[in-house]
Structures are given as structure tokens and as C-alpha cells.
A protein has these predicted regions:
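Boundary of Sec targeting at the N-terminus
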Residues: 2-4
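Intrinsically disordered, low-complexity regulatory regions in eukaryotic proteins
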Residues: 10, 15-19, 38-43
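N-terminal edge beta-strand
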Residues: 16-27, 31-33
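Short beta-strand elements of extracellular/lumenal beta-sandwich folds
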Residues: 32-51
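Helix-rich interaction surfaces within compact, conserved domain-sized segments
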Residues: 43, 48, 125-163
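Solvent-exposed beta-hairpin/edge-strand motifs
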Residues: 52-87
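Extended, solvent-exposed segments with strong compositional bias
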Residues: 82-116
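Low-complexity, intrinsically disordered segments enriched in Ser/Thr together with acidic residues
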Residues: 111-130
Length: 163
């Protein structure tokens, strides 16, 4: 996982060692509280081994920000590096809904998404007030499987203090 600050985070190092925990790459355009930000929650092709017919993103209950379905996009993306920024391009046709009082994003593509490219959920959101760490989780269902969702990994997002 990587934040827009690019700094090393000791908690990320600790979480990486937890059995069953898998950090996923993300990028935020702004990390200060109460600022408008774009969240790029990426699932790289190396992070999944099967096509996706449904993707669920769980949001912690203490993440006090308003997320609207119209501000959510599912797309093919490219992770940034030192010389390029993270960006999402071609939109993947999908039905996107919010459930569980806005704490579950359900994405159902019109056809299963193959494993050959990095995909991402792009959110336009106003960051919650105050600093904190928020663990968003990715769960996916694949074609032909029992309807149980498989854990793909987590984005541990840190918002810095100050205003």
C-alpha cells in the first residue's frame, strides 16, 4: 500500500506480517482532513488469479465521509511511480451500488473482468474530519464459483492531521 505522501509507514510494515493480510496499492490526491480527494483503490493483476464477476469494497463504520454512487468509477488503471502518476483510464461497464448505510460498495461488471490488467475503484470524496487510519477491504466473486466472496486484500489508508 502506498499513500500520496510516499512516506514509509511503520504500521504498514507491521500489518504486512499478519497472516492472511494482503496490502493493496492505493493513491490519494489529498491526505488532509476535510479536503476533496480522489481515491484510487487498485487491484493489480498480480493480486488476483481469477476473473471478477462481482467486487465488494467494505468501508469501516468509523470512516465518516459521504460517498455517492455517482462519484464511484470502476476502471482499468495504471499504478504510479516516481516518474508517473496513478491514473485510471477506460471505464469498465458495471452496476455500482452502495449498501449497509454506505459502508459497502457493490460493483457488478456487465461481463467478468479478466486478470490481464490492473483494475481500480476511483472515488471522489471529501476526507473525514480529523486524522486516522482506515482499512478498506476488497472481496471478489469469480465465475463458476460458489457465491462466497474471496478476500483479495486491503487498502490501509492514512489521513494526516491538520486542516
Amino acid at each position: 500500500a502506498q499513500s500520496s505522501t510516499g512516506g514509509f509507514d511503520i504500521l504498514n510494515l507491521r500489518w504486512k506480517n499478519r497472516e492472511g493480510f494482503k496490502p493493496l496499492y492505493y493513491f490519494l490526491t489529498r491526505t488532509r482532513p476535510n479536503q476533496r480527494s480522489t481515491y484510487f483503490l487498485l487491484i493489480k493483476k498480480k493480486d488476483r488469479d481469477r476473473a471478477i464477476m462481482k467486487l465488494d469494497v467494505t468501508i469501516p463504520s468509523y470512516f465518516k465521509a459521504q460517498i455517492e454512487p455517482k462519484n464511484i468509477r470502476f476502471a482499468y488503471c495504471e499504478a504510479g511511480s516516481v516518474s508517473s502518476r496513478t491514473k485510471c483510464g477506460e471505464t469498465i461497464p458495471a452496476s455500482i451500488s452502495l449498501n449497509n448505510d454506505g459502508k459497502l460498495i457493490e460493483i457488478v461488471p456487465t461481463s467478468p473482468v479478466p486478470t490481464d490488467r490492473t483494475i481500480g475503484v476511483e472515488l471522489q470524496v471529501r476526507n473525514p474530519y480529523g486524522r486516522g487510519m482506515y482499512q478498506f477491504n476488497a472481496l471478489a466473486q469469480s465465475p463458476g464459483e460458489v457465491t462466497l466472496a474471496k478476500y483479495l486484500g486491503s487498502w490501509v489508508i492514512e489521513l494526516k492531521g491538520g486542516g
